[in-house]
């Protein structure tokens, strides 16, 4: 590794944190110094930013701070994105105060250029924060391999810099001993401030269109930006949390003043929400300097402060140095040999309960405490450190193997936890499987000699009522249910998501059973699904089961046709054709676009009346015997699809979907007329099966949308369905729209209130 200090004359406190990612030793061009911030989203005590400022000053070059919010990071979702948006606001403000150019790129539809590849061609140097996990380290390596300038990584996360030690020690006490002198030298050091002239402005072209920060400070515009991102919208933001540097600093000052004195006594009580700093999200994203926290906690000088420092300096940094030293930190091969042997010995032990992925995610295990732990992660993005260890040691009992347990534990942590996708997360999940530990005899079923933490034992020492109240809290107090109009795929999925987050939900549907176009009709003469959605075989076969599963535990009122909706300041009133009314906190409508205008009393765009749809006439034929294959294989220019009523070889029902062109031509004809016309189209088949069959025609006036309408803003009404998301006219599109609609509904209601000014997040493993 090249000596960065000798090349660029950086001061020791920065040089020791550097590793050069390529072999280019000279700054030779007049392009900007690019400070690429990925995981250190602050301006105070930021080694990467300080190094960039010094280099720009030394070489008299422009300086540009670049932040990208990518769609490709593991478990990219609305929760993580929203925190990154918060961080961008403060980072922009901080750079402005320092007189530094800052540019934000949010990858999204129509905005996915290879920005860093372009900077690699034009920059004088690239300085980036060192984050030792895939895919971030691969991204840096790739840029370094093509860059025509020096690429420098700088540790901004640890008091003992990763390049200075950077070894994996098998036990925390050995790490403590090995780093004692390194730690002692740095713990109390003040961070040097820079007294520099404002750097030159970069007035050259940028390889992307920067996002105006005002688009993030407006919650309506922020949501619109989020909607363009290809991420998981079902993982909602934590509404009472705020990211960013300012909130992190306020939270730290409050804990330093009021919380650190009682930390040693209170830290293990998960029912005591204020017993820990709850700064791990801010630390993970580098919104606050760990060097600052350690220095100021060290100055307190109490036993409680020492214990707090122990967690940061030993257990946290031990994990970071371990991950830094490993090429593939997620793999089970990183466990000690004794643990691997133990897992091999218990590989065939009986697991009495095996959980599916959804059971894990939604906290549907056989254990009450574990379910509360997972609900805390799912809804609030946090899990108390002391419980997190017990939670993580339960997954081996409900999965088939060591690999499956590691994968599931990491998945649950990284998808939902605001501090997930972190070296501490990996070390924590792996510790639950034996990392950094010793054998415990005698061996037990499944766990072998790996340390066990019984859920029942932990529950016995926890105030379960207090912890349950803490976990089941909601940021928004409902007075009325959220009402979903339509019980098809879109309605069922949006209802499921809202219910999973603890909201009261009611679904209204005009049909006799839930399912909308996708429902399977159970008639005396046969079983069939005649929906015109673009369904795959499995989707057609399992549509009812999928929709009913989504609606499990949710109130559904069928045979209810909503005819009008009236908005009030804090609620919405829905009325059906019989004059019955419902009061709702907010509403999601899944109707076809042209049906919305009469329901909403002409408050939607006039062009929605004529929104373009494919139309289909469908013929349902019910025979006495199963449908012959010769009929299924028949093709005609007027017929879009011929299939069985359900994907069953013994089905006695035939479904014939006519093309849009044919259907539009005969759209206003009577059903009897259409039956006769379609039977004329089928005459060439000449099958006796039709002689004893019954016939019924159904008109799908709004079968599949051709375009997506422009979204409109309404504080308490939002829209879902296969017209509102790509791919249009498909089940996938309907589900995608539902996930965003559920997010949009809660987003608008929560952000109508004042956002908190402080980040509230629990400790790491």
Where are these predicted regions, by residue range?
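Central helical "cap/lid" subdomain
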Residues: 515, 580, 584-630, 688-690
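Glycine-rich FAD pyrophosphate-binding loop
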Residues: 483-485, 489, 499-522
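Glycine-rich active-site loop/strand segments that organize a redox cofactor
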Residues: 510-544, 552, 661
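Glycine/tryptophan-enriched, flexible segments
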Residues: 168-324, 328-334, 466-467
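Beta-rich, aromatic/charged-enriched effector core domains that present basic-aromatic interfaces
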Residues: 101-233, 429-432
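Conserved flavin/dinucleotide-binding core of flavoenzymes
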Residues: 431-444, 448, 454-475, 493, ...
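A conserved short coil-to-beta-strand element within the FAD-binding core of flavoproteins
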Residues: 558-572
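Active-site-proximal binding-pocket segments
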Residues: 269-463
């Amino acid at each position: 590794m090249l000596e960065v200090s000798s090349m660029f004359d950086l001061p020791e406190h920065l040089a020791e944190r550097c590793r050069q990612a390529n072999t280019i030793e000279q700054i030779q061009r007049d392009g900007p110094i690019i400070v690429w911030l990925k995981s250190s989203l602050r301006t105070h005590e930021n080694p990467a930013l300080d190094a960039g400022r010094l280099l720009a000053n030394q070489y008299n070059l422009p300086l540009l701070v670049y932040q990208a919010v990518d769609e490709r990071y593991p478990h990219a979702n609305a929760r993580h994105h929203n925190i990154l948006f918060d961080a961008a606001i403060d980072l922009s403000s901080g750079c402005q105060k320092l007189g530094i150019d800052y540019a934000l790129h949010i990858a999204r539809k129509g905005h996915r250029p290879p920005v860093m590849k372009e900077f690699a061609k034009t920059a004088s140097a690239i300085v980036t924060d060192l984050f030792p996990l895939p895919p971030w380290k691969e991204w840096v390596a790739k840029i370094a391999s093509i860059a025509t300038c020096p690429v420098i990584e700088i540790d901004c996360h640890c008091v003992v810099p990763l390049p200075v030690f950077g070894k994996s020690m098998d036990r925390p006490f050995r790490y403590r001993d090995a780093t004692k002198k390194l730690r002692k030298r740095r713990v109390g050091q003040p961070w040097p401030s820079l007294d520099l002239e404002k750097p030159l402005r970069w007035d050259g072209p940028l390889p992307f269109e920067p996002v105006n920060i005002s688009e993030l400070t407006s919650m309506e515009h922020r949501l619109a930006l989020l909607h363009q991102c290809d991420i998981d919208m079902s993982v909602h933001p934590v509404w009472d949390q705020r990211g960013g540097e300012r909130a992190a600093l306020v939270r730290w000052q409050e804990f330093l003043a009021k919380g650190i004195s009682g930390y040693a006594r209170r830290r293990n009580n998960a029912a005591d929400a204020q017993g820990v700093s709850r700064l791990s999200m801010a630390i993970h994203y580098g919104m606050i300097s760990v060097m600052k926290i350690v220095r100021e906690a060290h100055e307190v000088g109490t036993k409680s402060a020492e214990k707090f420092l122990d967690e940061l300096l030993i257990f946290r940094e031990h994990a970071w140095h371990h991950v830094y030293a490993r090429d593939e930190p997620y793999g089970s091969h990183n466990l000690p040999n004794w643990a691997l042997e133990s897992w091999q010995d218990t590989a065939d032990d009986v697991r009495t309960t095996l959980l599916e992925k959804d059971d894990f995610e939604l906290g549907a295990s056989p254990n009450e405490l574990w379910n509360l732990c997972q609900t805390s992660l799912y809804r609030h993005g946090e899990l108390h450190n002391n419980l997190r260890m017990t939670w993580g040691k339960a997954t081996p009992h409900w999965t088939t193997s060591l690999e499956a347990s590691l994968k599931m534990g990491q998945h649950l942590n990284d998808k939902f936890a605001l501090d997930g996708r972190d070296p501490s997360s990996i070390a924590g999940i792996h510790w639950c499987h034996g990392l950094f530990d010793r054998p415990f005899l005698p061996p037990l079923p499944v766990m072998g000699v790996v340390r066990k933490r019984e859920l029942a034992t932990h529950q016995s020492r926890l105030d379960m009522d207090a912890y349950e109240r803490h976990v089941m809290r909601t940021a928004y107090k409902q007075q009325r249910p959220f009402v979903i109009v339509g019980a098809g795929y879109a309605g069922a999925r949006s209802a499921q998501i809202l219910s999973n987050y603890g909201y009261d939900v009611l679904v209204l549907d005009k049909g006799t059973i839930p399912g909308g176009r996708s429902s399977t009709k159970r008639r005396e003469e046969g079983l069939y699904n005649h929906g015109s959605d673009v369904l795959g075989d499995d989707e057609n076969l399992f549509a009812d089961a999928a929709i009913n599963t989504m609606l499990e535990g949710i109130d559904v009122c069928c045979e209810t046709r909503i005819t009008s909706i009236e908005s009030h300041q804090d609620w919405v009133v829905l009325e059906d054709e019989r004059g019955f009314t419902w009061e709702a906190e907010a509403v999601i409508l899944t109707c076809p676009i042209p049906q919305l205008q009469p329901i909403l009393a002409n408050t939607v765009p006039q062009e929605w009346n004529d929104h373009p749809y494919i139309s289909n006439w469908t013929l349902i034929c019910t025979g006495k015997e199963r449908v012959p294959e010769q009929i299924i294989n028949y093709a005609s220019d007027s017929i879009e699809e011929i299939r069985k009523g359900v994907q069953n070889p013994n089905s006695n029902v035939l479904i014939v979907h006519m093309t849009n062109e044919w259907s539009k031509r005969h759209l206003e004809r009577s059903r009897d007329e259409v039956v006769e016309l379609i039977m004329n189209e089928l005459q060439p088949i000449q099958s006796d099966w039709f002689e004893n069959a019954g016939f019924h025609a159904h008109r799908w006036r709004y079968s599949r949308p051709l375009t997506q309408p422009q979204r409109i803003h309404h504080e308490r009404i939002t829209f879902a369905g296969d017209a509102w998301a790509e791919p249009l006219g498909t089940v996938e599109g309907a589900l995608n729209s539902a996930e965003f609609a559920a997010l949009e509904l809660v987003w608008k209601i929560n952000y109508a209130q004042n956002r908190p000014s402080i980040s509230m997040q629990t400790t790491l493993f």
